[in-house]
Amino acid sequence: MPLSLSKDKIRVLLLENVNDSAVRLFEANGYSEVERLKKALGPDELKRRLAGVHMLGIRSRTQLTADVLEAADRLIAVGCFSVGTNQVELDAARRVGIPVFNAPFSNTRSVAELTIAEIVMLFRKIFPRSVSAHDGGWDKSADGSREVRGKTLGIVGYGNIGSQLSNLAEAMGMCVIFFDQTDKLRHGNTEPVETLDELLASSDVVSLHVPETPATANMIGERELRQMKAGACLINNSRGTVVDLDALAGALASGHLAGAAVDVFPVEPASNTDRFVSPLQGLSNVILTPHVGGSTEEAQDRIGGEVARKLIDYSDVGSTFGAVNFPQVQLPARPTGTRFIHVHRNVPGVLRQVNDAVARHGINILAQYLQTDPEVGYVVLETDVVGGEGEALLADLRDVEGTIRVRVLYDHDRPVTK
């Protein structure tokens, strides 16, 4: 009887209408037990649904708490089919030996394109003119309508999205400056500035592209808004906690800022049927969108394929490359032999105990990979065919002090049968 679980026995649960590309990739790689639901699940229903599930895929609404993770008796990996992973308690997942994967760059182009579109819309005052036309008005005027060419775009956070945005903006003739906490290689003629205040005071439009951290909470408040040029615009397509929306509403209502575009909010509806409330509602110079910056068909297709591939690679060969909460190991499959993975607390002596267990059974180690972080160690162990010693060795590895979990990925002469 093989030690590893065959792929047709591995259960995959995908929530929140994960893209078809993920389902296709799982099925093309031999995973036939794939269930996909359109909705997010609350904690109690999620616990029930996770019984017997090996891999879980979610987007942004399903919340994976420590309580849920500890109740998932068979869960080996989580895929966040999104850029962020705020919906998962990452430390809790690591403590129970569950790596979490995401797609940090797959929607970069989509967010950058939306930002460019919003810059043009704000500078031309298209939104209020469109509303007026729908209401029967005819506001044909050049007053307050400006070209973007020659204007200064200030980018806060010069990462993947910020740098992509700078390329698009420069192609349209904009001058681009950026502020980042770390040194970044600049693209084209983009110029870094030393402080956030300098960027705010110099920009005709400011676009925010920073992560959600304690340092970025309300980083744009009343003081920072006063630092911005009179008549400037603000765009936030990053995280909802970055801007004090009450302060922004005041700056817009007073006329200090000419306009704003906001795609993310501190509190967002849990579903498309829930009511959305914001202090920015009713302001004609504000473009409000329902967190759709990365929601294009192309981005969702890329995200589906990228996250599914990472889950498959972990299940098939033990690769944790791209996991956000786990030691990073990337390695190919071997055509023969047996591959074990051993997740343990990062304490002295575990690797010695693992090797001693293998030696006691007279099994030869062909290759061994170890990576650690401050809390967790991850060993991938490649051995000769273990034969009848496999079950006993597996039991001994589970008995190693500090062990979190042990699995066999493939065994005997059946490579990657899982």
Q: How would you describe each model-predicted region?
A:
Residues M1-F101, L199-A201, G221-R223, Q227, ...:
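An N-terminal-biased, well-structured beta-alpha scaffold segment characteristic
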Residues L14-E16, P104, R149-E170, H342-V354:
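Glycine-rich adenosine-cofactor-binding loop
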Residues R61, D204, H209-E212, S238-R239, ...:
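Short glycine-/small-residue-rich Rossmann-like dinucleotide-binding loops
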Residues Q63, G84-Q87, N102, S106, ...:
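Residue-level detector of alpha-helix initiation sites
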Residues V96-T152, Q164-A171, S319-A323:
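Phosphate-binding beta-alpha-beta segment of Rossmann-like dinucleotide-binding domains, i.e.
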Residues V100, E222, G231-R334, H361, ...:
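Rossmann-like dinucleotide-binding domain for NAD(H)/NADP(H)
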Residues S141-A230, D246:
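Rossmann-like dinucleotide/phosphate-binding beta-alpha-beta segment
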Residues F321-K418:
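A conserved regulatory-domain signal marking ACT and ACT-like small-molecule sensing domains
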